[in-house]
């Protein structure tokens, strides 16, 4: 697998565009992804019981058509908790896009992100849609879907399948309200491989638990968020089927893209200054390892200690203890980077200057060794700073 300098339109047969329509005061806030042909599609969606209108419409269309040819996204207005009018507006957003592209409405996905409770300004939507073009500036799409994010989040890779080169690209937004189960964010992945929607869904579902479901910024789960994967077959490779080496290679490719996007989201948490990576090793099973890793990275006390560059391993141990995992606690090792701070559940003296260098880094790695099996789990998050409160206190102003 090779990482390339690309964007969401790097796979064959895809294009994208993004622009400022007026959902936000100044920044780009509206965009689309378009495939030359209907693409196989797979999706996972928010587990919040309150579900935004665009997500309902998109999920319904994916189930009905089993294909998707276009995806249109706005940022600044979530169209969530907007009642029957919100549903009507989401269907209209879908219909208007389909009409412009001259395709069936059920082949259009819609997504929105932003302030909950505000109705969609349909005149703004119509104006923005009139300006979007096929084969526009694909890099602008990554900008158009952002809200409180400080940077775009993209990744693109290629992989050989026999004589054919398959390209896969991903883009995501997410900075706050990140505690997925799915994943609290929007993420879109495009690919040019020949693969059915059913097989694509299998690959996505297998990989979401160890990627997007293992990030947390603030413990909040949004109402709008989803991951969609589109693969249009333009490479004309031999079809990728389940339980084959080609499927395993494709799944590994997808896992890499999803994990990279997940890490970029965690690193760009609102007000964040550091990425936190927690790895639990030698656990009884992978589920327990992932639960424990996410417990540690989600601890507010661990997050604030990391922000303060304080190697407070007691907070890490406490988060291990309340993770809900039944493991012996009398033989646990904890490391910050490669420095042991606890061995066999007993504190260890460490060099303060070496530890200061570790804690000043942009990425803090915490390793928890349970000595209770051979499974591994990882989770990602960020520190909790003064700016997180400031950003969210002033979000609507």
Swiss-Prot record:
GO cellular component, one term: cytoplasm
Enzyme class name: transferase
CDD domains per the UniProt record, alphabetical: OAT
Catalytic activities: N(2)-acetyl-L-ornithine + L-glutamate = N-acetyl-L-glutamate + L-ornithine; L-glutamate + acetyl-CoA = N-acetyl-L-glutamate + CoA + H(+)
Residues binding substrate: 147, 173, 184, 270, 392, 397
Gene3D superfamilies registered for this protein in UniProt: ArgJ beta chain, C-terminal domain, L-amino peptidase D-ALA esterase/amidase
Gene Ontology biological-process annotations: L-arginine biosynthetic process; ornithine biosynthetic process
Main location: cytoplasm
Active site as annotated: 184 (nucleophile)
The EC number(s) this enzyme carries: 2.3.1.35, 2.3.1.1
Domain of life: Bacteria
Pfam families: ArgJ
Keywords: Acyltransferase, Amino-acid biosynthesis, Arginine biosynthesis, Autocatalytic cleavage, Cytoplasm, Multifunctional enzyme, Transferase
Pathway connected to this protein: Amino-acid biosynthesis; L-arginine biosynthesis; L-ornithine and N-acetyl-L-glutamate from L-glutamate and N(2)-acetyl-L-ornithine (cyclic): step 1/1; Amino-acid biosynthesis; L-arginine biosynthesis; N(2)-acetyl-L-ornithine from L-glutamate: step 1/4
One GO MF term attached to the UniProt entry: L-glutamate N-acetyltransferase activity
Annotated positions for site Cleavage: 183-184
Site (Involved in the stabilization of negative charge on the oxyanion by the formation of the oxyanion hole): 113-114
Subcellular location: Cytoplasm
Subunit and interaction comment: Heterotetramer of two alpha and two beta chains.
PANTHER family from the UniProt entry: ARGININE BIOSYNTHESIS BIFUNCTIONAL PROTEIN ARGJ, ARGININE BIOSYNTHESIS BIFUNCTIONAL PROTEIN ARGJ, MITOCHONDRIAL
Record NCBIfam families: ArgJ, PRK05388.1
HAMAP family with a match to the protein in the record: ArgJ
General function of this protein: Catalyzes two activities which are involved in the cyclic version of arginine biosynthesis: the synthesis of N-acetylglutamate from glutamate and acetyl-CoA as the acetyl donor, and of ornithine by transacetylation between N(2)-acetylornithine and glutamate.
Family: Belongs to the ArgJ family.
Name of the protein: Arginine biosynthesis bifunctional protein ArgJ
Naturally occurring in which organism (per UniProt): Streptococcus mutans serotype c (strain ATCC 700610 / UA159)
């Amino acid at each position: 697998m090779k990482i390339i300098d690309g964007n969401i339109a790097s796979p064959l047969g895809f294009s994208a565009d993004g622009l400022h329509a007026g959902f936000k005061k100044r920044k780009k806030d509206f965009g689309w992804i378009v495939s030359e042909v209907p693409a196989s599609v797979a999706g996972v969606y928010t587990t919040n019981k309150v579900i935004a209108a665009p997500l309902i419409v998109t999920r319904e269309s994916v189930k009905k058509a089993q294909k998707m040819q276009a995806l249109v996204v706005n940022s600044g207005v979530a169209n969530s908790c907007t009642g029957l009018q919100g549903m009507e507006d989401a269907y209209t957003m879908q219909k208007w896009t389909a009409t412009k592209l001259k395709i069936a409405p059920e082949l259009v996905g819609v997504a929105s992100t932003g302030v909950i409770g505000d109705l969609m300004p349909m005149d703004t939507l119509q104006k923005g849609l009139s300006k979007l073009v096929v084969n526009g500036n694909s890099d602008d799409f990554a900008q158009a879907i952002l809200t409180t994010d400080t940077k775009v989040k993209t990744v693109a890779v290629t992989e050989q399948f026999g004589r054919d080169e398959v390209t896969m690209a991903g883009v995501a937004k997410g900075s706050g309200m990140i505690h997925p189960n799915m994943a609290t964010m929007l993420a879109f992945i495009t690919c040019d491989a020949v693969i059915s929607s059913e097989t694509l869904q299998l690959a996505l579902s297998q990989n979401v638990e160890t990627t997007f479901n293992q990030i947390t910024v603030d413990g909040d789960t949004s109402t709008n968020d989803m991951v969609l994967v589109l693969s249009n077959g333009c490479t004309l490779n031999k079809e990728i089927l389940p339980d084959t080496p080609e499927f395993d290679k494709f799944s590994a490719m997808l896992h890499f893209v999803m994990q990279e996007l997940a890490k970029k989201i965690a690193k760009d948490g609102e007000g964040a200054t550091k990425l936190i990576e927690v790895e639990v090793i030698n656990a009884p099973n992978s589920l327990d390892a992932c639960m424990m890793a996410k417990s540690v990275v989600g601890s507010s006390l661990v997050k604030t200690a990391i922000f303060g560059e304080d190697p407070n391993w007691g907070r890490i141990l406490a988060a291990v203890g309340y993770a809900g995992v039944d493991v012996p606690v009398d033989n646990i090792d904890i490391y910050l980077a490669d420095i042991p701070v606890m061995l066999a559940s007993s504190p260890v003296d460490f060099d303060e200057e070496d530890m200061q260098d570790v804690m000043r880094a942009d990425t803090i790695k915490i390793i928890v060794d349970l000595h209770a099996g051979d499974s591994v789990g990882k989770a990602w998050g960020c520190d909790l700073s003064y700016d997180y409160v400031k950003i969210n206190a002033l979000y609507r102003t």
